[in-house]
Amino acid sequence: CNSKGMNATALTYKLDASNKRILDVSRDALLRIFTCAYAYRMTGDAKYLTKAETDMNAVCNFPDWNSKRHFLDVGEMATAVAFGYDWLYNELSAATRTKAANALLKFAFQQAQDKNWNLNFYEATNNWNQVCNGGLVCAALASYENNPSEAKDMIEKALESNKPALEVMYSPDGNYPEGSGYWCYGTLYQVLMLAALNSTLGTDNGLSDTPGFSKTAEYMLYMTGLNSKFFNYSDCAPSSTAALASWWFADKYSNPSLLYNELKMLKNGEYASCAENRLLPMIMAFANNLNLDAISAPSNKLWSGKGETPVVMVHTDWTYTDTDKYLGIKGGKAGSSHGHMDAGSFVYDAYGVRWSMDFGLQSYTTLESKLSALGGNLWDMGQNSMRWDVFRLNNLNHSTISINDARHRVNGVATLTTTINTATELGATFDLTEVVSDQAASATRTVKIVNDKDLVVMDEIKARTDKSAKVRWCG
């Protein structure tokens, strides 16, 4: 809650360029209220209390929190008001407390109970389930005494709907289908919800025991390559950012080594611009019981995970110098949430250069408007969707196999068949047959680092009897 935040103009209800979201407003509100509430609790300086209360009143005076168009906005706004209400309860005016409790009821709880809205976040197996449920649970726990029936309903629905989502997103090994950027987002809200449940009710009802969930911070540890770049498959940007949820896992499992990359980023000043900085003060609570003085590098060079989007990542020595080489390879399918036609693609870092790369996501707002003007829908994941006309999203842009310049099959799954982990070779083989089955009889790809210095890519493709196979791929 710095001088820029303290002097920021009043929060106003404003849809973004897509006329669909107020998500930026919700996130700005969360940044202001959460950080100022934290600053007040740490310093006792009334200016932070005043600013947080002003911003709480502003958003509680909105006509709604945009539940009709984009319920994700509600999840983040409910989180903002919940933390302000809970952390500042004794110091807030009675009028503000009443207004906040009423807003949570009217704009969040009742909207989550209204069948007129698209409430598919309850059935979703992606970050929406985590963010919307996480925000609603925090709000329900904070204001339970005011609206016990609705709050109880929010908590019970979250416990019921979140468990199957976790099983899809993290089982069996912890790798996250939507990639690094959405791990930082969705998993952060997930641990926020778990921490709130445990601190208030003494249990998370077994959610944290979901197979693979305890391993997911290690997956994220291996997702960072050289030069501060993620293995950025799916709708994710290449620049690495703070994985704030890793602090919860380090505390939960008494394993500070999970913070090897986080401490490096923190010391380099990279946390100052982290994507999820609106919840940055959380790490202070999670770090309270950790010894951060001597954290060693991971002992294993390779990490592999199966599940919806199987991946294999390699760091040859974890020094982030010229002796360290980094490789990330993925399988899965384009039809997954935020998926690209990138099954079989890989990134490779060596000697300060990302030799094989992924462009990553493109602005949703611009793509939505452009495709809509052409009669398309960015979020239509069907085989013939205009989504796949976008160069960044189709296979012709990725370092995977393309045959006869045809699109990958959106529901074809590339499976991890072999993990290569020997003294001289590190990598994996994926079977891409389903992905290209309309163009080839079979296809496999092997990518490996040999002797910690050479990259080998080997594709084995068997043509169909009824057509030739013109093969291409780019890096």
Residue ranges with predicted function:
Residues 1-5:
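Hydrophobic alpha-helical membrane-insertion signals
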Residues 6-14, 18-226, 236-237:
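Aromatic-lined, polymer-binding surfaces characteristic
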Residues 178, 182-475:
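Extended polysaccharide-engagement surfaces of secreted carbohydrate-active enzymes
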